[in-house]
Amino acid sequence: MKLSPLPVLLVEDEPAVMAYVRAALERSGYPVVCCESGVEALRLLEGGSFLGVVSDMRTPGGVDGGQVHAWIARHRPDLAGRVVFITGDIANEETVATLRETGAPCVEKPFRVQQFIEVIAKTLGKV
């Protein structure tokens, strides 16, 4: 297995979920940079290069996954088609609206690693 030359930015505030997703990505050849909030994600996106972004829909600090995607669309359009959302709240009206607006794929928690990695490979490319 070869490694991607660029890391995936993982935005997830739940430590157990972050560890699970990070391990799944790394085992599949994707290096990972983790952060716990949308605010931190924006800071990292301003100065870093990433293969793509995996973001929880709900993150602390006043900037959620949808707002991270909106920022990416404005400031890093090269990444706009390489965002994957993860959420345990797929039926929430705000989540549904964000998914409709962005067109980004979403994997509902809890999920199987194989299901998640299939979405990642389709969205970010296989490594």
Region locations from a protein language model:
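Acidic, metal-coordinating helix/loop segments flanking the phosphotransfer/catalytic sites
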Residues: 9, 22, 34-52, 60, ...
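Phosphate-coordination loops involved in phosphoryl transfer and adenosine-cofactor binding
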Residues: 3-6
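Short amphipathic alpha-helix used as the core "switch/output" element in two-component signaling
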Residues: 43, 64-79
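The C-terminal output helix
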Residues: 121-127
